[in-house]
């Protein structure tokens, strides 16, 4: 199944209050790191500013410290020498998750990007793992691969995404499920941890589906991507496989602007305690 979700209402890149951009930047931040850790580490960095008496200077320095921390310690880099594909790809994973959550009722996205050893490294793990339980007789597990292209078109993109999804199926790797459980219990997310324990221990039945998201710059998209995938021999292991195409105008600018706003969420966490 192929669904074409073309952005009909583009966010305003110049509006600091744009809800679409601010929502994406928030989820980019929490997708890369634990909110409580981020907040506490920023508070530690800001302690030396308590003696400053000039509010304008203090506010400027606080903003600079938070921005530097988020950009250097949490988010991937888009500077020369680093993998730009990580910068672009991580955005795609977050956008795809939000589409599933907002439009289809999935919950609790597990992003592989949070568990990389380094922020600019790739990790061998399914891009997306989300759960849907409401209104279903059995839980539905969605595994997804996301391919994001913000520049030229690669007509083999769909085939590459399909092959990645076949390779990185978490349900076929008990160590990955155990890893999920360990992380969730350590974070005191007991409900979610118990759910994955039931999967790992084969206590509950569940349905599963596989999604391939192709997030692409609208101006360079070619239907050849889907034509090539349609003529490709698909793996029988991908149960309920579907493709979702998301075409976005000025995708690279949207990505960069979303990252640049991520620090604002930290500022709000600190002010609200």
Task: State where each predicted segment sits.
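Acidic, metal/cofactor-coordinating or nucleic-acid-engaging core segments within structured domains
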Residues: 152-223
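Nuclease-adjacent, charged terminal/linker segments that flank catalytic cores
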Residues: 1-67, 74-75, 254-273
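Non-catalytic C-terminal interaction segments of nucleic acid-processing enzymes
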Residues: 209-273
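Conserved catalytic cores of phosphodiester-cleaving nucleases, focusing on short active-site segments
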Residues: 100, 128-130, 142-148
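Charged, often glycine-rich, active-site loop that binds/positions anionic groups
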Residues: 120-130
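A short, highly charged nucleic-acid-interacting micro-segment common to nuclease
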Residues: 75-97, 114-119
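A short acidic/basic microdomain associated with nuclease active sites
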Residues: 103-121
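Short, solvent-exposed loop/turn segments that connect beta-strands within catalytic domains
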Residues: 134-140
């Amino acid at each position: 199944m192929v669904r074409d979700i073309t952005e009909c209402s583009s966010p305003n890149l110049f509006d600091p209050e744009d809800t679409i951009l601010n929502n994406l930047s928030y989820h980019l931040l929490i997708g890369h790191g634990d909110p409580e850790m981020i907040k506490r580490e920023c508070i530690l960095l800001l302690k030396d500013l308590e003696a400053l008496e000039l509010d304008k200077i203090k506010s400027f320095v606080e903003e600079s410290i938070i921005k530097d921390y988020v950009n250097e310690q949490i988010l991937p880099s888009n500077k020369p020498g680093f993998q730009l594909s990580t910068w672009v790809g991580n955005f795609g994973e977050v956008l795809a998750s939000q589409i599933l959550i907002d439009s289809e009722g999935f919950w609790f996205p597990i992003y592989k990007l949070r568990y990389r050893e380094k922020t600019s490294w790739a990790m061998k793990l399914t891009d997306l793992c989300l759960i849907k339980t409401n209104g279903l007789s059995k839980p539905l597990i969605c595994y997804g691969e996301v391919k994001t292209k913000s520049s030229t078109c690669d007509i083999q993109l769909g085939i590459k995404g399909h092959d990645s999804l076949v390779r990185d199926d978490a349900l076929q790797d008990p160590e990955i499920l155990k890893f999920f459980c360990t992380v969730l219990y350590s974070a005191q997310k007991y409900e979610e941890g118990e759910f994955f324990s039931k999967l790992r221990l084969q206590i509950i039945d569940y349905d599963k589906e596989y999604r391939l998201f192709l997030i692409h710059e609208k101006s360079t998209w070619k239907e050849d991507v889907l034509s090539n995938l349609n003529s490709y021999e698909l793996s029988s292991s991908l149960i309920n496989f579907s493709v979702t195409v998301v075409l976005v105008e000025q995708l690279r600018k949207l990505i960069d602007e979303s990252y640049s706003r991520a620090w604002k969420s930290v500022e709000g966490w600190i002010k609200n305690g």
